Structures are given as structure tokens and as C-alpha cells.
Amino acid sequence: MARTKQTACKSTGRKAPRKQLATKAAHKSAPAMGGVKKPHCYRPGTVALHEIHRYQKSTELLICKLPFQRLVREIAQDFKTDLRFQSSAVMALQEASEAYLVGLFEDTNLCAIHAKRVSIMPKDIQLTRRIRGERA
């Protein structure tokens, strides 16, 4: 093969643009053709914080009424059969029990934070109840 003379070409001082691969070109043009949009994903913990703020603002009951009512009737049957409850009595029980549970979880969270953790554990609830004097 005969040698050919190379001619110098003018340099612009930057790299020549690369040619796109066929897969990249197809990938970039796919959403424009009406592909399904991926749902927005929040960072871990963001949704939990939104829920915390939402439930702290609200005053509605968090436990469903009918399952709670069934639980009350089931527990009451152990003491006496054929007991009847006024709806206001069940609501008062539910308000009191939810207030107790919210307070218990607040104190339990403080115990977990004191132990340099962010997740509550059964031992935190046990410690909280022991400090409160509910369980010896």
C-alpha cells in the first residue's frame, strides 16, 4: 500500500464531539414519544415527616371506630356477659386510650433518642412504663 501525505488540519482547541450510540439516542427520544412517566419518589424519611406533621395538626381519632368498639365489647365480656354500651361511652374510652397511647409513644421516642437511636424498640416502651410506675 502506498504512503499518502497527511495534511495538517486547523485545531480549535477543544475535543471533537462524540457520536451518540444508538441506544442513548433511543433512550433520550423514548419519553418524547409518549412513554409512561415514572412516579415521583421522595427521599427516605420525607413521607414519614409529612405524616408526623399531618397527624400532629389533626384532632380526629386515629383508630377506626368499629374495630375499637368490637375490642371493648370483647374485653368487657371477660368481666360480665350481656353488657351494653352507650355510643358516648365507647367514644370516651377511645379518646382516653388514644391520648394514653400518644403520650406513651412520645415518651418512648424520648427513650430511644436518649439511647442514640431513631427507631423505638420494645425495651423503650418497657422503660417508659417502668419510669411512669405503671409496671414494676
From Swiss-Prot:
InterPro entries to which the protein is assigned, alphabetical: Histone-fold, Histone_H2A/H2B/H3, Histone_H3/CENP-A
Modified residues (Phosphoserine): 11, 29, 58
Modified residues (5-glutamyl dopamine): 6
Record PTM N6-butyryllysine, positions in chain: 19, 24
MF (Gene Ontology): DNA binding; protein heterodimerization activity; structural constituent of chromatin
Residues bearing the modification Allysine: 5
N6,N6,N6-trimethyllysine PTM positions: 5
PTM text: Acetylation is generally linked to gene activation. Acetylation on Lys-19 (H3K18ac) and Lys-24 (H3K24ac) favors methylation at Arg-18 (H3R17me). Acetylation at Lys-123 (H3K122ac) by EP300/p300 plays a central role in chromatin structure: localizes at the surface of the histone octamer and stimulates transcription, possibly by promoting nucleosome instability. Asymmetric dimethylation at Arg-18 (H3R17me2a) is linked to gene activation. Asymmetric dimethylation at Arg-3 (H3R2me2a) by PRMT6 is linked to gene repression and is mutually exclusive with H3 Lys-5 methylation (H3K4me2 and H3K4me3). H3R2me2a is present at the 3' of genes regardless of their transcription state and is enriched on inactive promoters, while it is absent on active promoters.
Keyword terms, alphabetized: Acetylation, ADP-ribosylation, Chromosome, DNA-binding, Hydroxylation, Methylation, Nucleosome core, Nucleus, Phosphoprotein, Ubl conjugation
N6-methylated lysine PTM sites in chain numbering: 10, 19, 28, 37, 65, 80, 123
Phosphothreonine, modified sites: 4, 7, 12, 81
Positions of region (Disordered): 1-39
Pfam families assigned: Histone
CDD domains: HFD_H3
Residue list for modification N6-(2-hydroxyisobutyryl)lysine: 5, 10, 15, 19, 24, 28, 37, 57, 65, 80, 123
Signal peptide start-end: none
Residue positions, PTM N6-glutaryllysine: 15, 19, 24, 28, 57, 80, 116, 123
Modified-residue entries (N6-methyllysine), positions: 5
Modified positions (N6-lactoyllysine) in chain numbering: 10, 15, 19, 24, 28, 57, 80
Sites bearing N6-succinyllysine, chain numbering: 57, 80, 123
Main localization category: nucleus
Gene Ontology annotations for the cellular component aspect, listed alphabetically: nucleosome; nucleus
Disulfide bonds: none
Function: Core component of nucleosome. Nucleosomes wrap and compact DNA into chromatin, limiting DNA accessibility to the cellular machineries which require DNA as a template. Histones thereby play a central role in transcription regulation, DNA repair, DNA replication and chromosomal stability. DNA accessibility is regulated via a complex set of post-translational modifications of histones, also called histone code, and nucleosome remodeling.
Subunit field text: The nucleosome is a histone octamer containing two molecules each of H2A, H2B, H3 and H4 assembled in one H3-H4 heterotetramer and two H2A-H2B heterodimers. The octamer wraps approximately 147 bp of DNA.
Protein name per UniProt: Histone H3.3C
The species this protein was found in: Cairina moschata (Muscovy duck)
